[in-house]
Amino acid sequence: MHRRSSGSPVEDDAEDSPLVSRSPTESTAHGPNNNAFETAEKSRSQIAKRGTSFDLRRDNGASTPRSRNSGLWRTPSSSSTSSTTAMATASTETKSSSASFLMPLASQRLPMGTSPESSRFRSSRLRSPWTCSILTALTTLVASVFLFFIVRSFSARQAGEDGCGIPVMSPTFLHMVGFDTEHTRFASKYNLYLYREEGVDFYNQENLGLNGAPVLFLPGNAGSYRQVRSLAAEASRHFHDVVRHDQERIKAGTRSLDFFMIDFNEDMAAFHGQTLLDQAEYVNEAIAYILSLYHDPKRSRRDPELPDPSSVILIGHSMGGIVARTALTMSNYQANSVNTIVTMSAPHAKPPVSFDSDIVHTYKQINDYWREAYSQTWANNNPLWHVTLISIAGGSRDTVVPSDYASISSLVPETHGFTVFTSSIPDVWIGVDHLSITWCDQFRKAIIKSLFDIIDVRRASQTKPRAERMRIFKKWYLTGLEPVAERTLSQKEPNTLLTLEDKSNSILPQGQRLILRELGHRSGPKVYLLPVPPQGVSGKKFTLLTDQRFDKTGEHGNLEVLFCSVFPLQNGKFATVFSMNMDFSGGNTGSTRLACKNAAEDGIHLPASTPASKYPFDRVQPFSYLQYELEDLSEHQFVAIVDKADSPTKGWVLAEFSDSSDAVIRVRGGLGGLLSAGLKMRLPANRPMLTEIKIPALHSSLLDYKLQIVRHNHDKRQELFAPLLRQSISDPHESKFFVNVDKVDVNLHGVAPFMPPPLREQATLGGVSFQLWTDPSCGSTVDVSLKVDIAGSLGELVMRYRTVFAAFPLLVVALVLRKQFQMYDETGYFITFAEGLDTALRSSFPILLLAMSLLASSLATSAQIPPSDEPFQWPVNATETPIDFTKNDLLLGSQDAFFWFLVPVFGLISVGVCVILNYIALILLSVLSFIYGCLRTRSGYIKRNEKGTPIFSAPTARRRMINTAILLVLVSTLIPYQFAYMVACIVQLATCVRAQWHAKETRSTAHYNFSNYAHSIFILMLWILPINILVLLVWAHNLVVHWFMPFSSHHNVLSIMPFILLVETMTSGAMIPRVTTRLKHVTSMILFAIAVYSAVYGVSYAYLLHHLANILAAWFVVIYFFSSGFSLRRLWLILEGDDATQGKSEPGGSHQKKKP
C-alpha cells in the first residue's frame, strides 16, 4: 500500500494503490445525519493502525501518531479478503515494493496530541476562509480609510491649471524608404521619417528640400513618431515667418531645422532593457544615414560653400530621452555625431519601474558611463565633453513619470546641462502633463526659439560651441532670477552717450525709491537718475519692475534703462565711440555726459499681476524686471530710467536699491516645528518692493503646504500691481509663479525618495524660497502664513511610492505563508489565509514593522550609509571621495528621518490591500467553483466512492512531465519565462477552483488543508504576476509587429522551472508534506527573507522578488520530491508509460452513480 500526503485528496496511482471501497461502518459515518469530522476524531486509533506515513522529523520514540488522510479513510480493495483483514489489523505497515517509485505525494498522519496549540487549531480547522477576525477587520478598515484619502488626495492634487494653447499645423511625413536592411537590421521593425510642413516647406519626389540643421525626434514608451508634428510645424513656420527675414541671423549661420523622426512602432522600452538597447542601436544607424543625405545634392538644397553636417540634434520625449543618452554609449556611435540633447519628461535618474532586470542594469551602465565621462580631469579623456543635455520636466501634472526622475544633477555637471520645469520657462509658466509637453503651444515656441539661437551651419557641428549653447539655454529656460543666471551688463561696452544739463533735477537723493505712476506726463522724454550706492555697502540690491517693455538701443518704445558712468570729453571725439547719442541738455554748454550701457538684454519677464489676473499664463503682456547685485554695478555711478513717451501713457515704473537685511528673511527651525506650529510673519509697511523668505527646512517633495497672504488697509485703486509670488528651489530649477496672490497651494520637487545624490554634494540644502513682489507705496502691512496641507500631502505618496504598493504587500503575504507553514508543520492543519494573517498581525508583523521603522530612521540619519548589495558602485579617482549613488535605494529611499512613520503606514495599507485581494480571489474562486460543479454534474455520471467523496481527478504523472518538458523547451527557445509564469498562474487558478469545490463537497480536513494551501500559493503568485506581466506585454507587442527575434535575457529555464514543477505537482491534488525536523526552519527563513527584501529592496530592485519566490517554489519542490523517497527508477517507469492506469477506478474501488 502507498502513502499519501497529509490530508491529500488525491487518488494514488492505480498501479501502486488501487481505488478502495469503504466499510459499512465508514459509509454509515458519512450519512446525512452524521458529521464526517466527528468520525475522523473518533477513529484516530483505527487510523494509526491502518496506514503508514513519511515523517521528516527524527524518530525519538515519542512521536505522536498522525492520521494519514484525515477522517475519510479508504481500505485498499483486492481480490483477497484476507489481505484486507491483514492490512487493517497491522499496527505498523512497511512500504510496498513500489513505494520508492512514488511521485511527490508523500503524506503525514495528523497528530493526536492534546497540546493547547494543537487543540486550538483542531478546533479552528473548520474555520471558513471567509472568516475575518476583529483585529483583521479593524486593520482593513483603517487601511481602507488611508487608501481612500490617498487616492482622493491624488485625484484632487495640487497640480495646477491646464492652460496650454492649441497648436496649428499641416503635417506631412515622408518615409525614408532608402533606410532599409542594407543600413540596419531593424528595418522591418522601425522606420525613419522626415517632416515637411505643407505649404511652407519645399520638397518633391526628387528633392527632399534639406536646407538646414538636422534634428531627430525620438518618441517615448509606446509613443508615436507623429508627436513631433507640433514642434516641427512651429520650426517651419517660425523660420518662414521670422528668421529668414532677419539677415543678421542668416549671416550668423541660422538656418531652418530639418526634423526627422523615428517610428519605434510604439515599442515599450520602459519595461524592457533589451528593447532600449535595440532602439539606441537603431538611432545611431539613423544618424549616420541622415548625415549621408546632406552629401547628396539631389536631396539637399544647401549652400555648397557650407560644410556638410557632422552632428544631429536629438530631442527625446519620455523614454526617447533615455534612448538618446544610451545611443552615445553604444559601440556603433560615431564620435561627435551628437552634441545637443533636449529631453522632455524623461526619467534620467531611475527607471520608471524596476520589474525587469535588464532595464535596471541598462540604466546603471548608462548612468555610470555618463558619470565616469564627466569625472575626467582632461577634456580629451571625456567623450561627452562637447555634449549639452537639457532635461525639461512637466511638474505635478505629469502622472506617468515622476518629475523628480527628470533630474540630471547626479549625471551631468552644471557646465554641461541642467534640469528645468516648464513652470519656470519665461512666457510659459505652466505645468504640463506627460503627453501635452510635446504639443503645448507656449512651450513648443520656447523650445524652437532656443534651438534656432544655437544653430550655426557655418560649423560642421551645425551648432555653436558648448559654452555658448549653455548660455543660450539658460537664457531661454531659466527665469533669470537663479544664482547661476548670467548677466551681460559687465561684458558689454558702453554704446550710448547720455547728455544732461548740469542743473537738471532728475537725480534722486541717495536711497530714495523711484515711483512713476504714469509715463509721458511731461512733454518730451524725461530722464531719472538713481545714484548707485558706493561699493563696500554689503547686501545692497537694485530692483526695477514695470509693466512696459525695455527698449534696446535704437528702439522707439516708452522706456529704456541705462547704467551709466561719467564720460569726460576728449577733444570732441566722443561721437565716434557711441552708436547712440541721447541729448537732454537742450543745447546748453554746461552739461554732463554719461557713458551708458543698455540693460534690455538682462531684462526678466515676470507674469503680469493685476487685480484682474487669474493665472500666470494669461495671454497678456508680461511685466519687465531688472535685478542686480551691487557688485555687478561696480563700474557705474548712475541708473538712468528714460521715459521716452511723448504724451501721457498708461504705465508705471518702480525702482529702488534695497538692503538684504530688510529684503531677505531666513526662517530658522526644523521641519517638526514648522509642521506643528506653522509659520506666521508680518511684513512692515516700509518694506522693499521684493521680499524673499527662505525656509531651508522645507525641501521634501512629500509635503504640500498652504500659503496665505493678507494685506491690511490697502487701496486697490492706488496699487500699481497686485502681489506677485515666486516659489522656487535651486536643484532642480523649479519655479512657480502666482499672480494676484491670496491663497496658494505649495508643492515642490525637492528632495525626493530613491533619488541618487548629485555629482557635487551640497554642503547644505537650500530648501524652498518665496519671493514676494508687493507695491510698497500703498503703506499697508502684509501677513504671511504657511501651514502643512496634510490632505494634499497624502496624494504625493502615489507618485513617489507607486512601486511600494506592489512590494510591501508581498511582505504581508510572505509573513502569512510563514505562519501558515509553521502551524501546519506543528499541528498538521493548514490554516486559512485570513487566519494566518490574523496570527501574523498578533506576532511577527508588528515586530518586523518596528524593525523596519528603526532601520529607515537610521539610514536617513546615518552619515555613511553602507553600500547596497547590488554592485552599483561608480569607480572614481583615488583622490576623490567616492559617491554611493545607490545609498537612497534602501527601504523608503528617504534622506529625512522625519518620514520613518511611512513604514508602518505602508505596512498597514498593505494589510488592507492583501485582505481585499484575498476576498476578491475568494469571490472569483467561488464563482468558478460553482461553474465547475455545474459542469461536472451535467456530465451524466458522478464519480464518487461509497462514502460520497468526489475523486480529485488529475492527469497522469507521465502527462504532467511531458507538459512540463514541452513548456521548458519553449521557454529556452521561443517564449520568455514570463509567459510560462502566466500559464502557471492560470493552472494554479484551475487547481484552486477544483480544490475549493472538493473541500465544499467533502468537508474533510484533508481537502480543506489542500484548498487553503493552494489558495495561499495562488495569492503569492498573484503578487508576483505584475513583475512579469510588463515584459510579457513587450513580447506580445513584438509578435503583433511581426518581430520574432527572441529575448536573449528572458530564456533562463531556471527562472521558471521551480514554479512549473510546483504548479504541475499541485494539479494532482498533492498536499505538501509536513517538515518536522530542523529543516522546517528553512521554509521560515526563505519566507522571512522575502518579507525583509520586499521592504528593503522591493522598490528599487523589484525584479528580484520573482527570483526569491522562485527559490521558495524550488524548496517546496524539494520537499515534495525527496520526502517520499523519490528515485530515478520511478522516473524511468513513468517515461516508459507504466502509469497508464493512474487515476482510473477499478470495479471494487468505486462505483459510478447515474445522475438523477
Swiss-Prot record:
Q: One Gene Ontology cellular component annotation?
A: endoplasmic reticulum membrane
Which residues span the membrane? Answer: 131-151, 797-817, 845-865, 897-917, 966-986, 1016-1036, 1053-1073, 1081-1101, 1102-1122
**What InterPro entries does its record include?**
AB_hydrolase_fold, PGAP1-ab_dom-like, PGAP1/BST1, PGAP1_TMD
Task: Cite a single Pfam family from the UniProt record.
Answer: PGAP1_2nd
Where does it primarily localize? endoplasmic reticulum
Renumbered to this chain, region (Disordered) spans 1-95
Compartments in which it is found? Endoplasmic reticulum membrane
EC numbers listed for it are 3.1.-.-
Residues carrying sugar: 877, 1009
Function in brief: Involved in inositol deacylation of GPI-anchored proteins which plays important roles in the quality control and ER-associated degradation of GPI-anchored proteins.
Which protein, by its recorded name, is this? Answer: GPI inositol-deacylase
